[in-house]
């Protein structure tokens, strides 16, 4: 039950953070799910196409660009596109002076995903070594997820939808404990 309360508090904190006005990235403590505003220099030449499904389960790419903000390098996840939009100039139209987004810590690479094909710019994970090999730069552990009403690429919606199975776990363990207690009482009564 303690972990359930901890998880509910964590979800509440994330929801609260996502509804607050954005803060200046340079003048704030970096933390997960922080809404930020910033400006920087986007590198369209080293754009990364990360294979992913959209909200409807359709395959495509998330467009990720290196962005330099006051000498610090970040990855900017601009959103999802269909396969046919890859390398289209139409997707390189972001105003570099008014970026609003959400900071999120980079997930660890899944060992079951295929290797990135850096030469064809076809990515399955944002493996830090591969990203360095491709861009020649080291990046913050936080990714900026673009926020806004853009059509192409369509920004990924970041919300507090994190796994919370603690109620199920508690119910399972309490049910198991009660079952064992009832079996114990049944056999104890039978033997006396």
Language model segments and positions:
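Surface-exposed, charge/polar-rich loops and edge strands
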Residues: 2-27, 34-192
């Amino acid at each position: 039950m303690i972990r359930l309360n901890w998880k509910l508090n964590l979800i509440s904190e994330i929801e609260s953070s996502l509804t607050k006005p954005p803060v200046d990235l340079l003048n704030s403590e970096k933390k997960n799910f922080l809404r930020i505003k910033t400006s920087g220099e986007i590198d369209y030449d080293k754009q990364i196409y990360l294979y992913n499904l959209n909200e409807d389960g359709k395959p495509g790419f998330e467009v990720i660009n290196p962005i330099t903000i006051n000498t610090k390098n970040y990855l900017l996840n601009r959103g999802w596109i269909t396969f046919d939009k890859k390398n289209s100039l139409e997707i390189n139209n972001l105003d570099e002076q008014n970026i609003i987004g959400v900071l999120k810590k980079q997930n660890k690479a899944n060992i079951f995903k295929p290797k990135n094909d850096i030469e064809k710019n076809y990515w399955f994970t944002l493996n830090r070594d591969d990203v360095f090999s491709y861009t020649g730069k080291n990046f913050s552990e936080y990714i900026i997820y673009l926020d806004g009403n853009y059509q192409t690429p369509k920004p990924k919606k970041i919300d507090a939808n994190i796994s919370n199975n603690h109620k199920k776990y508690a119910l399972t363990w309490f049910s198991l404990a009660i079952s064992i207690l009832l079996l114990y009482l049944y056999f104890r009564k039978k033997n006396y």
